[in-house]
Structure formats: C-alpha cells, structure tokens
C-alpha cells in the first residue's frame, strides 16, 4: 500500500519549492532593504551563490531523486543568518567556497587533474585576499583530496599551491603600485595572529542563535546521512563525508576564533545545507514531518528575531 505523502515529502519533491523559496527570500530582502541601506551587493552575491548551489547539486547528483532542497536550504539559511547585519566579506568568501566545491569534484579519482585543482584552489586564493584565515582550511582540503576526491599527488599538491598564490601576484602589483607594501605584510600577519583566540567579547545574541540552529541542522543531517547513506553511490558518499568534515572544522574554527563567525558561518552553511536537505528529502513518517515543520518554524522565528530585535553583545 502506498504511503500518503506528508507535507515534508511534498515540499522536498515539488518543482515549485525553489521558486517559492526564492520569491519569499527576495521579499524579505526587499523589506529589509527598505530599512537598511546598501544591502543589494550582498543580495546579488547571495543570489549568485544560490545558483552555484543549484549547479553543484545538478552536476554531482547530490540527491538520487528530484529535489531542490539543497539550494532551498542554502538560501533560507543565508537569509536567516545574513539579515539585517550583512557582511560583504562573508558573501564573497561563501561564493568562493561553493565555486571551489563545484570545480574540485571534477578531479575525482584523477591524480593528474592539475588544471582543475589549480582553478579550484584559485577560488580559495581569491577568498583569502579578503579573509586570510581561510588558509587554515588548506590542510583539511588536502586531506579531502587524499581521502575523498582521491586526486592527491605531487603534481596536484603543487597545482593547489600555485592556485592559492596566483591571486596574490595581482594583489602584490596593486600594493606596489599604491606604495602600500605594509598593507600586504599586515594582511599576512593576520594569518598568524593568535592573540584573539577564544575572544568572545564581540559575539552577539544573534550570532549565537544562528550558530546554534545551524549546528543543530548539521548534527541532524550528519547523523541521518551516516545511518542511511548505503543507498548512494560511492562518489556521492565521498561528497557528503566532505561536507561533514568541513562542517566540523568550521564549527571548531568558530569556537577558536569567534570574531570571524560571519565568514566561517557562511562556510558552515555551504556544508550544512546539503546535509539537512538530504534529511528532508529522504526521511518519511509523522515524526520527521513534525521535525521538519518545527525546524521551519524555528527558522522563521530566528529570522524575525534577527530582523526585529537589536543585537546585544553577550559579554
């Protein structure tokens, strides 16, 4: 006997989920834009990042059935966490990280894919121009190449280094032209600045609320995937295991350097969105339907709280 579809199942399989989510998100952005000036550049980056998530889902078949939950989850979480206090730096870093994922999986099981590796890590290099601390992810990304994309070799290792450095060739020219070599030196000094570890003096209630909710989604999505991933192809499992590893790394880095919670939070959302989308798409039953509805209500309430209630520094 066919099981009756729940609200969760209908949303997950609907072709209208992404258009409706995009419309609602746009209305929220426009409403906030009437109150807060200069948010449209960030809105444009969020829209482009969402399109990249659509492409990431399509190209890598993240869902073994039709579903737009990856891009819907990403857009909903970015709208919730980003408004009304937007960060252009965070928006750019987030888009670059998605672009990295989109490119690096072309290297799957190909240890001679120096070209794709170069382009993927050039995206990380671009992100590091404005957020040098993303360099802390480099060892983890190399582990990813060894264990998950199975593309690590001496050639691809050096290709990743060259890709990371290339944006600085152009940036160095700019700093020389403007006679601001000290600015370039200060940029790299931030990479080894450990004086602000565990500095929670500027963390706000909004940031803690957003992080707690996204972490909850990460845990739910990760546990569900680990328990039920046997139905997926090996390549798909590798991709999701990468999401789990990078989510854990992002949370650890946020705990260590909470002053970078916006930039790291964007990276966390990129990795969490597919995990919770997998949960929404492939779970059945009344309990998971109720869980989905509760998570949806929590997201709306947190979004309303972020927009309507002024931020408060906790310490």
Where are these regions (language model features)?
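Juxtamembrane membrane-water interface segments that cap and precede transmembrane helices
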Residues: 23-30, 185-208, 221-225
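Membrane-interface alpha helices of multi-pass inner-membrane proteins
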Residues: 82, 117-132
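Perimembrane helix-loop-helix junctions
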Residues: 137-162
């Amino acid at each position: 006997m066919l099981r009756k579809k729940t609200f969760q199942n209908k949303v997950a399989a609907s072709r209208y989920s992404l258009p409706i989510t995009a419309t609602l998100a746009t209305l929220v952005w426009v409403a906030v834009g009437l109150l807060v000036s200069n948010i449209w550049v960030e809105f444009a980056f969020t829209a482009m990042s969402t399109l990249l998530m659509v492409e990431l889902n399509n190209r890598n078949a993240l869902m073994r059935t039709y579903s737009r939950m990856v891009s819907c989850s990403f857009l909903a979480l970015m709208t919730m966490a980003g408004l009304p206090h937007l960060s252009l730096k965070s928006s750019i870093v987030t888009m670059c990280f998605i672009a990295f994922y989109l490119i690096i999986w072309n290297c799957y099981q190909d240890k001679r894919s120096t070209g794709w590796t170069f382009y993927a890590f050039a995206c990380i290099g671009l992100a590091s121009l404005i957020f040098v601390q993303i360099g802390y992810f480099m060892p983890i990304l190399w582990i990813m190449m060894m264990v998950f994309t199975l593309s690590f070799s001496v050639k691809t290792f050096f290709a990743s280094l060259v890709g990371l450095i290339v944006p600085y060739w152009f940036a160095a020219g700019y700093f020389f032209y403007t006679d601001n070599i000290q600015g370039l030196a200060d940029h790299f000094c931030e990479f080894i600045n450990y004086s602000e570890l565990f500095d929670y003096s500027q963390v706000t209630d909004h940031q803690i609320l957003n992080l707690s909710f996204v972490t909850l989604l990460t845990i739910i999505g990760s546990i569900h995937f680990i328990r039920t991933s046997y139905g997926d192809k090996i390549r798909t499992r590798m991709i999701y295991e990468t999401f789990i590893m990078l989510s854990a790394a992002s949370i650890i880095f946020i705990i260590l350097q909470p002053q970078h919670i916006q930039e790291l939070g964007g990276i966390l959302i990129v990795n969490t969105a597919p995990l919770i989308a997998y949960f929404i798409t492939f779970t059945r039953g009344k309990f998971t339907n109720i869980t989905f509805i509760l998570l949806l209500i929590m997201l709306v309430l947190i979004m309303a709280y972020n927009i309507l209630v002024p931020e408060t520094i906790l310490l």
